[in-house]
Structures are given as C-alpha cells and as structure tokens.
Regions:
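N-terminal secretory signal peptides that target proteins for export/translocation
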Residues: 1-11
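Gly/Ser/Thr/Pro-rich low-complexity, intrinsically disordered segments
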Residues: 3, 16-22, 26, 30-344
Length: 344
C-alpha cells in the first residue's frame, strides 16, 4: 500500500486496548500526494488559478478550525496532522464517567489523506489488534470497524474495500460509503446472482455466516481455505475458472480463481448442469464511484436529527452500558470517528 506512517503516540493506549478486531477504519496519508499549490506555481507560473486554489484551501481551513473550536471549546484538542484533530473529553452518564475520544478529519483541508477499511489478516476469518492493523497499513488513526463474529473474526455486514465486495449486508443494516471527496450513508441491500448458460440463481449473501437453512451463500477465497458445512439437505458447487469442477455435500476447498456456492440441493440442482458460471454482485443503493463501504448500525443521527432505529435493524439485543464506536460525517463532509468507554 502506497502510504506513509505518521506516528502519534497519544493514540497507542486506545488502540492497543481493543483486541480481537475483525475490521478497522484507518486514516492513511497517501504517498502519491499532489505537489502543493506553492510548488506548482514555481513550476508552471499559473498564479491566478493557483492563488484561487490557495484561497479556497485557506477558507476551508478556517471553517474547519472554527467548527472544532465551536463544538469542543476548551476540551483537549490535538492536531494529529493537517486537517486531522483529536479531542479527548470526559462526560458523566448516570453519575458515572464516560471517556470519549473523537477524531475529526477534513478532506478539503488535506487532500493527501485517505479513509478506508482494513481487515485483520489476508482472510476474513481472523482477528487482530487495532494497533497491529494500523501499523501494517501505515495508518495515522484507526478505530474498530463493523460488527464481527467473536469466535472467528468474520465481519458481519457489508464490507467493500477498493471497490471489491468482501461481505454482504445482514438485515439491510446501515452502511457508510466512502468516496474520493466525501461520504454517504444508507441502509444497504445485496443484489447478487450466479449467472450461467442454464439460467441464473439468486444469491442471498456473500462470505457471511448462514442465517437460514434455505439461504444460498457464495464463499470466495477471501473467506478462507474452506467453505463452511452445507445446511441440512444442502450441497455445494465448486466453481473454478468459470466452470463447475466439483459437487460436494460437505466442506469444500475454495479455488483461488473461483468460488463455492452453498445452499439447498433443490436450488443448486437447477444450475448443476451448466457449463459457464459467473458471479454478478450489485449493492443497492448503487453508489456511483464509491471506493469503500463499511456496515454498522443503528443510525444515531440522520439528516441532522436524532434517529435511533435499533429495533428496525434488529440490534435491540446490543443495548446496555458497553464501550461504543461511532462514525459519521458533517454537512461539509468532515469525517467524525468516536469511541466511548464508560463500562467501568
């Protein structure tokens, strides 16, 4: 990954305390940063345009600084990097302290920054400390990302990294799309099919634990070396190079150049005699030019208003006093990352 690590020791305590993380959200400082406006002016001599760019950047810096001051006042604010602020505060809930860490980032102030999810290891079924993930990917800031299965580390919910879909949504939960110049949030649905010369087969999910015995799920090499067991009365089709190479009723080795379809035998038999197989994956909404997607939930704020929909996203069971992570963005596309630790 073409990035530069900018170390900030004040984040080590928060990072190393979170073990067993399946996904992390990282800030990366891109090594492919464009020349500054000042440098370009010396080389090209197009000063009117560059002066305008410089003025625009200074204006964005002013807005960002004023916003931070207005929101956090006398709180402990540290500049991590140009356009990145770290805020520490303590608030009290039911007479007990809640330690809050907040990072705000403005892409408009520092275009050399990038935001992207990162998985714990080469495969989805793995766990790692945030500090290890951040160090590996040269991140200047990192927090734990979406939900994951504690036993294996497999992400639970939508995950796309660099336009590649790793996992599909669970219960159409809310996810954040990360673009070159901003962010969007929406509840996400999967539209996936296995397309063959004998017709198509609807896919219920990708690289996710089975929710129902009637679901048909595709497992790619990102899942790991082997697919999970088949459901009762189920079977597996092993696809390599676009062709069916094996039919199995138990776990199957996932080809590096293919995938394994796992589902009810009755459903898979409809395409078992096909000669050509292709996996077609679409995400709804079809965000144009989205680079990354990471799922979470529930909503906390929507369109500027408090909007907590735990029941609608089937998250009512996670209530109670626990450490929490939140991510969001402002109307001027500044990113907000927050952790709250108030269990003690």
């Amino acid at each position: 990954m073409d990035t530069i690590l900018v170390q900030r020791p004040q984040f080590e305590k928060a990072a190393t305390s979170a073990a067993g993380i399946g996904i992390a959200i990282c800030f990366l400082l891109s090594q492919n940063t464009l020349l500054s406006a000042k440098d370009l002016g010396n080389l090209t001599g197009i000063s009117p345009t560059l002066n305008y760019v410089q003025e625009q950047q200074r204006h964005q810096e002013t807005i960002f600084e004023e916003s931070i001051t207005q929101k956090y006042g006398s709180s402990n604010v540290v500049e991590v990097e140009k356009g990145v602020k770290y805020v520490r505060m303590i608030r009290f809930y039911k007479n007990k302290p809640v330690r809050i860490n907040i990072v705000e980032m403005s892409l408009g102030v520092n275009q050399g920054l990038a935001v992207e999810p990162a998985i714990a290891s080469e495969t989805l079924a793995s766990r790692n400390k945030i500090s290890n993930i951040a160090g590996r990917d040269n991140a200047i800031v990192a927090i734990n990302g979406g939900y994951f299965k504690p036993q294996t580390g497999v992400p639970l919910g939508t995950l796309m990294i660099n336009k590649k879909v790793y996992t599909g949504p669970i219960y159409d939960r809310v996810a954040m799309g990360i673009f070159d110049n901003g962010f969007e949030m929406a509840r996400v649905q999967l539209k996936a099919n296995v397309v063959t010369n004998k017709g198509g087969l609807k896919i219920d999910n990708i690289n996710q634990p089975r929710m129902l015995s009637t679901n048909t799920i595709v497992y790619t090499p990102d899942w790991g070396e082997y697919s999970p067991p088949s459901p009762k009365y189920g079977k597996q089709l092993v696809i390599s190079g676009g062709k069916l190479i094996k039919t199995s009723y138990g776990r199957s080795q996932i080809p590096k150049d293919g995938f394994v379809i796992v589902g009810p035998q009755k459903s898979l038999d409809t395409i078992a005699n096909a000669r050509k197989f292709k996996l077609d994956i679409k995400i709804n909404p079809e965000w144009k030019d989205v680079n990354h997607i990471i799922s979470g939930g529930p909503y906390l704020v929507k369109n500027g208003d408090i909007y907590v929909d735990m029941t609608a996203q089937k998250l009512a069971s996670i209530g109670g006093r626990n450490p929490r992570t939140a991510i969001g963005y402002t109307k001027d596309n500044s990113l907000i990352m927050l952790t709250a630790d108030g269990r003690e």
